Each structure stands twice: as C-alpha cells, then as structure tokens.
Swiss-Prot record:
Subcellular location(s) of the protein: Secreted; Secreted, Cell wall
Biased composition (Gly residues): 22-45
Xref: InterPro entries: Cerato-ulmin_hydrophobin, Hydrophobin_sf
Protein name listed in UniProt: Class II hydrophobin CRP
C-alpha cells in the first residue's frame, strides 16, 4: 500500500515538472528591395495537440473522475480532435469527460489531467 502511494506521488511530481508544449502557427510576409522585388507569405497551420505532456500522453474519454486525479472506465478517443472544444464534444457524445492520461491498464487510467485548452 505504501509503495503505491509513493509511486503515484512520484509520477504526479514528474507530471507537474514537465512543461506543456504549445504549437505556434507560422505566418509572415516579405518584400524584396533593390533591383527586384518579391513577396511571400507563410501560412502555417496550428495543429491541436490535446495531450502534450510526456507523462499524460494518452487522449481518453473517461466516465468517472476520482478526486481530479484518477479516472475509471476510460476509452480511447474515437476520432482525432481538432480543438479543445471538439475533444470535449467527442467525449460528451458518449457521456464522458475529455482527459489526458498515462497509459491505461485494463480501462483504468490511474493518472489523468484536463487536456490543453480546457
């Protein structure tokens, strides 16, 4: 029992220590000067990454949340979310909450957190 408490505490501290990655979109324009001129634009698109943490890397739809840490009866997200609101609505169709979890074991995602943007 003490080992599991220590293990969960250790994993939780790792999760808090890892920085969240946030994607940035590219954009810009340019013009040339001198004898010639030119223009350009960078139309980069921002890809939504719901679970950017190394530890909490699994996007899951979970039915039961225990104290905001452990989640039970989780399923893999059936489609790729394009935003935080789409992730939330995908899970809501089955009456579940959008979560980012550690690798689940037998449907029990023991450590979970809210995805980026929620």
């Amino acid at each position: 029992m003490q080992f599991s408490i220590i293990a969960i505490s250790f994993l939780a501290s790792l999760a808090m220590a890892s920085p969240a990655k946030r994607g940035g979109g590219g954009g810009g324009s340019g013009s040339g000067s001198g004898s010639g001129s030119g223009s350009g634009s960078g139309g980069g698109s921002t890809t939504y990454t719901a679970c950017s943490s190394t530890l909490y890397s699994e996007a899951q739809c979970c039915a039961t949340d225990v104290l905001g840490v452990a989640d039970l009866d989780c399923e893999t997200v059936p489609e790729t979310p394009t935003s935080a609101s789409s992730f939330e609505s995908i899970c809501a169709t089955s009456g579940r909450d959008a979560k980012c979890c550690t690798i689940p074991l037998l449907g029990q995602a023991l450590l979970c957190q809210d995805p980026v943007g929620l």
